[in-house]
Amino acid sequence: MSYSTQQDILDFVEDNNVKFVRFAFCDIFGTQKNIAVLASNLSKALEEGVCFDGSSIAGFMHVEESDLVLRPDLSTVTILPWRPTEGRVMQFFCDVEKPDGAAFSGNCRGFLRDMNRKFKKLGLTCNVGTECEFYLFEKDDRGRPTCIPIDFGGYFDVAPLDAGENLRRDICLTMEQMGMAPQHSHHESGNGQNEIDCRYAGPLKTADNVMTFKQIVRAIAMRNGLHASFLPKPLPQQAGSGLHINLSLYMDGKNLFEGDIAPDSIAGSFMAGVLAHSRELTVFTNPLPNSYQRFGCDEAPRYVSWSRQNRSQLVRIPMVKGDSCRMELRSPDPACNPYLAIGLILAAGLDGIDQRMVLQPPVNRNLFDAAEAEGLGLETLPATLEEAVQVAEESEFLRKVLPEGLSKRYFSEELKRCAALRSAPDQAEHERVYYFNAI
């Protein structure tokens, strides 16, 4: 669907028996929120926006200055296919602003949109694609999630070892109904672990797609009596789940990642910027204490390095051709806020271009092998969430690109997460209640 005016939206609502309209947004951690507006009140909501209490949303506002307004992006309208066909449910993604129309520093969609505009001013077009991994778990007799995966399958397995085939099919078909373009789906390495890759799009559209994808997966899992988890490391002895982010740059219709990448080219400088700032970005790409259990094994990187093909590297250049040429950042996980994560990756690449950073030579070693990595003098990603917060708080780069209010609130909330886990009598139970059941 593609609509540009309020009247277009109202006509669609009337023609398609829509009774509820979700005004969707996310908190600073990327947890989706929404307010459902009845169709009879939609005209007013489109005209005036929808007011809400920002002090009740993680990382938004203090109670003494809590009023905020949701402004829908009309281009994002979509029907939710898993909801009833009688009295249908429609959804917008929204930007968040202050009641007087002033910008709100916690509007993560706005941050990503502004970052993309900076590339457009340079004559550059950014495309972003994602590869999202997740686990499917059984529920107990009371409908509560268990830690029992739905199968014993491994990488690329098929039925009967793969019990998720039909769910992935339903997920992909629902994605297509909602205007997304799934490309590949398969069983991943872990028992009950799955991956679905989505075709690249513009940065903002891709971030919206990540939010929608997680909605779809959870809804279809729930419909089948299962629990879908996007926790980075839900099972200690199984592979972690990543959200690999693929990026390409175009100028005058040419993919700058196609062919050999000169160290001082635009693509080379972009990669150099991402690598240079990767430690500072980690608190945003890997926002949970659990995120750091994933690094250094099962194809999740630990060292700041790049290579062609090598999956032990932080940045990989796949051996492909044409529009598929890209760089792949392998550290992010699906618990991240995709608007902040993608926006900051673009900001790091842009800083590399602005500073004319030169890409260092590739490292063609297996960095999952400690003996191989030893002596190379490579920087490592932060080992804990506390370290990631400290690195980010000391970052001059982040002070330059992030609104001060947003970064302060984000770091404060992250430190609260760390303190809550440290003080929990049973850390495993704390992680299950606050993360496994919710992420």
Question: Which residues does each predicted region cover?
Answer:
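Glycine-rich, acidic/polar active-site loops that bind/position phosphate-bearing ligands
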Residues: 1-439
